[in-house]
Every structure is written in structure tokens, then in C-alpha cells.
């Protein structure tokens, strides 16, 4: 997989946003939490991930490049809030009351669990399977497990084993 280059101006905008919200949090909480590490290695349809123990935020470079400022404004505080909640409260529900409080009361941003960015460019190819009652789209990972004989999947409605039909033209 080739690494996408994130323009320096976009990286600076990410860091400016991160520092703004971290400063807000440190002032509000009376803490001196360090700056988390940021990298651009998140894959798939997730916009970002917070790695709690390593105090690191991973951002999806494709979604960042496609959405720029709206991505920064939404995803950076969202992931930072996860890190801050972990430092402040230890292990709690990922989008629980502590996280909502951190987002809304401390960082002063809406607490949204999921992004609404277009993901067609990062969605993985799927494979069509069928049972008695409907068609199912399996990811490449699940499809490969079926091919290797490591897994079989059944329909939740009828209970029948899924049978491979075709590759989706995504």
C-alpha cells in the first residue's frame, strides 16, 4: 500500500486544532496532559482512532484529504476526547457519559459518535453471497476465510449457510 502525502498546511491545521482543544481541556480540568502523537495510518472507513495506552491518534489520510477542514473540526476533537477521558477516568464506555461530557462541556463541540463523510473511495470491495431468503455482501477478509475453509457464515434470518455468487463491481 502506498503512503499518501498529507500537505504540510493540512498537517499544521490538524496540529493547530489539536493544540487548541488540548489547551481548552488542560485549562478546564486543571491538568497538563501532553500532546498526543498524530499519525496518518488509519485505514478503511474509520475517520480516526484513539490508541489509549500510547496516547496516539490515527487519522485516515484519504478522508482527511477529501474533507479537509470539516474532517479536522469533527474528528480531531472526537479522538482527543477519547484520550482525555481515558487519562481522566481510566476505562469507561467509549462513547459513554464521560466522553459526551468531555466533548460538550470541556471541548465545547457536539458529541457525535459517527462521521457522515462520503466513504466510497475507502470502502473495500465486497463479495456477493446468497442464502434462501436474501443476498449478503461479505468483506474480502471474510470471503478469504471462506475460501481457505477457516469460516462459514450463516444468514441470521433463515440460518442457511451462505453460498458465494459474484464479486461486487465496486
Curated annotation (Swiss-Prot):
User: PROSITE patterns, per this entry?
Assistant: ZINC_PROTEASE (PS00142)
- Compartments reported by the entry: Cytoplasm
Q: Which Pfam families match?
A: SprT-like, Zn_ribbon_SprT
Q: Does the keyword Zinc apply?
A: yes
| Residues reported in the UniProt entry to bind Zn(2+) | 78, 82
Q: What is the protein's name according to its record?
A: Protein SprT
The alphabetized UniProt keywords are: Cytoplasm, Metal-binding, Zinc
State the similarity comment: Belongs to the SprT family.
A Gene Ontology biological process annotation?
Answer: response to stress
Annotated InterPro entries: SprT-like_domain, SprT_Zn_ribbon, Uncharacterised_SprT
Tell me what organism the protein belongs to. Answer: Yersinia pseudotuberculosis serotype IB (strain PB1/+)
Amino acid at each position: 500500500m502506498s503512503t499518501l502525502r498529507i500537505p504540510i498546511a493540512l498537517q499544521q491545521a490538524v496540529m493547530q486544532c489539536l493544540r487548541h482543544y488540548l489547551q481548552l481541556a488542560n485549562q478546564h480540568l486543571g491538568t497538563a496532559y501532553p500532546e498526543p502523537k498524530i499519525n496518518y495510518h488509519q485505514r478503511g472507513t474509520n475517520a480516526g482512532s484513539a490508541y489509549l495506552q500510547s496516547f496516539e491518534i490515527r487519522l485516515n489520510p484519504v478522508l482527511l484529504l477529501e474533507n479537509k477542514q470539516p474532517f479536522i473540526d469533527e474528528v480531531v476533537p472526537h479522538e482527543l476526547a477519547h484520550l482525555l477521558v481515558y487519562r481522566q477516568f481510566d476505562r469507561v464506555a467509549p462513547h459513554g457519559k464521560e466522553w459526551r461530557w468531555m466533548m460538550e462541556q470541556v471541548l465545547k463541540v457536539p458529541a457525535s459518535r459517527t462521521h457522515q463523510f462520503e466513504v466510497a473511495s475507502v470502502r473495500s470491495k465486497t463479495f456477493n453471497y446468497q442464502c434462501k431468503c436474501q443476498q449478503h455482501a461479505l468483506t474480502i477478509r471474510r470471503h478469504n476465510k471462506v475460501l481457505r475453509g477457516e469460516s462459514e457464515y450463516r444468514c441470521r434470518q433463515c440460518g442457511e449457510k451462505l453460498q458465494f455468487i459474484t464479486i461486487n463491481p465496486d
